[in-house]
Amino acid sequence: DDVLNILVYYHLNEFSSGRELLQNLEEDEYAKRLIAPVGGVKRSTFFDTVNERCVEQLLYVFCELQKQAASRLPARHVELGTLVAVDGSFIDSVLSMTWAEYQTQNNKAKLHLGFDLTHGIPKSIVLTEGNGAERPQVSSLVQPGETTVSDRGYQDHERFDKWHEEGRHFICRIKENTHMAVMEELPLAVNSPAYFDAKVILGVASGKQTKTPVRVVGFKFDGVSYLIATDRFDLTAEQVMLAYKLRWNIETFVRKHDQIG
């Protein structure tokens, strides 16, 4: 509990280093009375404990805060179901963190983030080495019944089938040159901003191809063309577009995180 309180205090006050934190715990009356354990904190003990348990403690704090926030914040766009945007971001690491392998002289960890678009807050996180692949983490970030919302880096036809079988829905932008075999063109609403809506098979038979038909919605925004693959046939084309546009919230969050870091 002492380590947990100190770590929360550290991040709330945005200390520049552990040494600055320890100095504050020794000199600040509030910190000495309510944060530091009785008898103070030994530097060597503190750093050893943090190196061994920091991630575990912070993950616990994150999970508890996420539960409380989700229960109090209003839910938006509930008609779309539970939407979870996924993305990855690098975190600088010291060379002694050998598990965070990235480059010979540059260790980085990778934060895989699931962002709850319904409540506008982070939902789930996974930490891997910097070279860790992003697509395999989706099954840890998104639960069955929820919908993954992702960019082109997560396009994987075999995983689309796997997620569908597991009950994990997906709304994923795909590359413009993706081969599509149209099985059925779906009707568009009058004056719809979408220019394409169809049930298709993605990929070619000689390569990686979806076994289960998916839906692809095409639209343009600010002069850029988007193709969105999904298994959500229950939504309108406009709702698929809205769900993908909401994904940009995670990019805003990640950019702010990188600026703070």
Predicted regions and their residues:
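Catalytic micro-motifs at enzyme active sites that drive phosphoryl/nucleotidyl and oxygen chemistry
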Residues: L34-I35, S71-P74, W99-E101, R159
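Short Lys/Arg-enriched helix C-cap and helix-to-coil transition segments
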Residues: Q57-A69
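A short, well-structured juxtamembrane/interface segment
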Residues: Q66-A75, A133-R135
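Single, function-defining residue in the core of a domain
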Residues: D1-G18, N24, N51-R53, Y60-V61, ...
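DNA-recognition alpha helix
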Residues: S17-I35
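Major-groove recognition helix of helix-turn-helix-like DNA-binding domains
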Residues: L34-R53
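Short hydrophobic/aromatic segments of transmembrane alpha-helices and their interfaces
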Residues: E29, P74, A237-E238
